[in-house]
């Protein structure tokens, strides 16, 4: 029988075709422990899946890696779905993964994600729906197991923070098929009490199966529709349940839930003292500013009082009168000097002074002064005025 000699590439391609045509290998479901886990910059995920007897290299392409509901870690036991194929270039076979789920949680995890997506689409996780937790509650309702560590932690934290806050405990199952119903009844009971300010829904840590009651759909609606604000503290910090998403506030632990629901009286007192001091300082500053403004207004009023205005008015009148008197006196003095000067001029040019110098004034019979001889004719009569009297004369000869 003749057997063809194959090249390495031909052999690898042949093996790839054989593997790819195998139904089981094309629809593989494998469980094992993750090792050498790595996120590549391309977005692809590379890791190995191993057990006590062997190991297989795995790859998950970016399109599937983006759909992961959790972050895989080395040492984590998982279930993987995918297909086995051969990488021709290296001649190595590997598992091409399409899904990765934590081992033992596959169905529960899928149910959790399905319900979470449903409630998310209904808007039940909206921040707009979440209410503020009362800052100064008088009564807090606690729903949890009466025998677990959670109730002890809640009581211890609440007592330490504020002894004046009362609590009513509603003991219920916190795991098992009957737990959701009891939790819902406890919620209804506390919602019907008018004295309840806040509700704490809590339990200690556990496996996903033990915490599953808090992933119940009916319980989620009951928490969402609660008339009282609900604080959840289920499991440990890394545990998330459906009620955590629909509650008004999620706490990582039952103790943390008590810290959220119960105010620290010492911190509140210190805050009150600080606020009082700040208020006192603010009031004192306000009063001092008003006193300063009042003093300024008082000074302005004193400066502009009617009495001061009248006194200032009288002073202004006196000053004005003084200035006016001075100006009038000065004006009179100037006018007197003018009169004296004009009088001197008049006296110097007075006809009487001219007559005193030996001159005389000749006028005709009607009193007109005659200054030229051509105004006379023979035998006109004239009057001659001397300094000490008058004489009448007749013109006999004109020369």
Curated annotation (Swiss-Prot):
Its EC number is 3.1.11.6. PANTHER family: EXODEOXYRIBONUCLEASE 7 LARGE SUBUNIT. It comes from the Bacteria. HAMAP family: Exonuc_7_L. The keyword DNA-binding does not apply. Heterooligomer composed of large and small subunits. Keywords: Cytoplasm, Exonuclease, Hydrolase, Nuclease. The gene is xseA. It is found in: Cytoplasm. Belongs to the XseA family. InterPro entries: Exonuc_VII_L, Exonuc_VII_lsu_C, OB-fold_nuc-bd_dom. GO terms for cellular component: cytoplasm; exodeoxyribonuclease VII complex. Pfam families: Exonuc_VII_L (PF02601), tRNA_anti_2 (PF13742). This is Exodeoxyribonuclease 7 large subunit. It catalyses: Exonucleolytic cleavage in either 5'- to 3'- or 3'- to 5'-direction to yield nucleoside 5'-phosphates. It comes from Clostridium acetobutylicum (strain ATCC 824 / DSM 792 / JCM 1419 / IAM 19013 / LMG 5710 / NBRC 13948 / NRRL B-527 / VKM B-1787 / 2291 / W). Bidirectionally degrades single-stranded DNA into large acid-insoluble oligonucleotides, which are then degraded further into small acid-soluble oligonucleotides. GO terms for molecular function: exodeoxyribonuclease VII activity; nucleic acid binding.
């Amino acid at each position: 029988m003749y057997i063809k000699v194959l090249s390495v590439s031909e052999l690898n391609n042949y093996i790839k075709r054989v593997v790819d045509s195998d139904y089981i290998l094309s629809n593989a479901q494998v469980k094992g422990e993750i090792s050498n886990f790595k996120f590549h910059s391309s977005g692809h995920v590379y890791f190995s899946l191993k057990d006590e007897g062997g190991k297989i290299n795995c790859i998950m392409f970016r399109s599937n890696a983006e759909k992961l509901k959790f972050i895989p870690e080395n040492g984590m036991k998982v279930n993987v779905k995918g297909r086995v194929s051969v990488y021709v270039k290296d001649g190595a076979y590997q598992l091409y993964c399409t899904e990765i789920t934590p081992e033992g949680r596959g169905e529960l995890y899928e149910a959790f994600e399905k319900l979470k997506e449903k409630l998310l689409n209904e808007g039940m996780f909206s921040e707009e729906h979440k209410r503020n937790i009362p800052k100064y509650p008088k009564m807090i309702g606690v729903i949890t197991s009466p025998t677990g560590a959670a109730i002890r932690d809640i009581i211890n934290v609440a007592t330490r923070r504020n002894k004046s806050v009362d609590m009513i405990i509603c003991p219920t199952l916190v795991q098992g098929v009957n737990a959701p119903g009891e939790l819902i009844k406890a919620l209804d009971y506390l919602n019907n009490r008018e004295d309840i300010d806040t509700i704490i829904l809590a339990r200690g840590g556990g496996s996903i199966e033990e915490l599953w009651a808090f992933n119940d759909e009916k319980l989620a609606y009951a928490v969402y529709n609660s008339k009282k604000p609900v604080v959840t503290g289920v499991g440990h910090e890394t545990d998330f349940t459906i009620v955590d998403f629909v509650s008004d506030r999620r706490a990582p632990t039952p103790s943390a839930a008590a810290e959220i629901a119960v105010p620290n009286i010492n911190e509140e007192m210190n805050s009150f003292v600080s606020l009082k001091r700040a208020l006192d300082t603010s009031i004192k500053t306000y009063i001092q500013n008003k006193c300063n403004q009042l003093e300024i207004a008082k000074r302005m009023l004193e400066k502009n009082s009617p009495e001061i205005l009248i006194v200032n008015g009288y002073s202004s009148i006196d000053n004005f009168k003084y200035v006016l008197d001075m100006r009038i006196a000065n004006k009179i003095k100037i006018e007197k000097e003018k009169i004296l000067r004009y009088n001197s001029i008049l006296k110097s040019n007075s006809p009487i002074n001219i007559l005193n110098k030996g001159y005389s004034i000749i006028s005709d019979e009607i009193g007109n002064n005659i200054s030229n001889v051509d105004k006379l004719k023979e035998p006109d009569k004239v009057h001659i005025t001397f300094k000490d009297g008058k004489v009448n004369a007749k013109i006999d000869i004109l020369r």
